[in-house]
């Protein structure tokens, strides 16, 4: 099991449903300003945003590095693949990366990813993503939390240092025989300064909006157009 698959198993215990819906609404409202007929959702998760855009008449494809997430998408009849976004064929009117997907990449990987996304955009295409602010990492994401049900227990311990957030997930799930299976892994996220996004070859940063998702100004929305 990859660390992203562990996240997929634990996501329902994190209490992020309201924040996820708020992000979906924000992205959807931004895309309303453009004539989007095709969309690629990078880091599509369980496909919630694709479902919303499909209801608006947009043809959607999703990619995610969690096989569990992709399986759930396919079970809903959504077009999703478990592979790096750079390996997806075709061009799209819009590409989105929702809920700090970019923060999961180190600088060099991120720059390569952004250039590959530019290549997958139609002329005048739009790419929208959100990132955590420094405050979002140091004051909001850092810390501990736990949650449990009759069948599961989750502990999350996050520490931010040297512009990296290391989040350890420990999940216990009850088996049919009454015993518990333990899953544990660490996910690393990276803080990126806005200046990094202002010097791209294939994408032009046309708008940035710092907003509050969990707390005051903990996220920034980035809107790019293809150069």
Identify the function of each model-found stretch:
Residues 1-34, 36-45:
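Conserved class I S-adenosyl-L-methionine
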Residues 46-86:
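Class I SAM-dependent methyltransferase SAM/SAH-binding core
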Residues 86-95:
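A short acidic, Gly/Pro-enriched loop at the edge of an enzyme's catalytic core
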Residues 94-109:
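A short SAM/SAH-binding and catalytic strip from SAM-dependent methyltransferases
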Residues 111-123:
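A short glycine-rich, Lys/Arg-flanked "PGG" loop and its adjoining helix->strand segment in the class I
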Residues 124-131:
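Conserved beta-strand signature within the Rossmann-like core of class I S-adenosyl-L-methionine
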Residues 131-194:
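SAM-dependent methyltransferase
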């Amino acid at each position: 099991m990859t660390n992203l698959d562990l996240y997929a198993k634990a996501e329902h215990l994190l209490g992020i449903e309201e924040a996820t819906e708020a992000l979906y609404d924000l992205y959807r409202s931004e895309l309303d300003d453009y004539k989007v007929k095709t969309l690629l959702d990078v880091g599509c998760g369980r496909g919630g945003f694709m479902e919303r855009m499909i209801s608006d008449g947009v043809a959607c494809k999703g990619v995610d590095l969690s096989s569990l997430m992709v399986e759930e998408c396919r079970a809903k009849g959504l077009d999703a693949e478990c592979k790096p976004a750079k390996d997806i064929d075709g061009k799209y009117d819009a590409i989105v990366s929702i809920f700090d997907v970019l923060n999961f990449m180190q600088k060099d990987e991120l720059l390569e990813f952004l250039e590959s996304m530019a290549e997958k955009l139609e002329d005048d295409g739009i790419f929208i993503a959100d990132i955590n602010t420094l405050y979002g990492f140091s004051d909001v994401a850092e810390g501990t939390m736990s949650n449990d049900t009759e069948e599961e227990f989750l502990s999350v311990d996050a520490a931010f240092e040297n512009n990296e957030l290391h989040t350890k997930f420990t999940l216990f799930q009850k088996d049919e025989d009454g015993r518990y299976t333990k899953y544990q892994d660490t996910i690393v996220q990276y803080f990126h300064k806005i200046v990094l996004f202002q010097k791209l070859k294939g994408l032009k940063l046309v708008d940035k909006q710092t907003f509050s998702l969990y707390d005051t100004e903990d996220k920034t929305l980035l809107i790019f157009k293809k150069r």
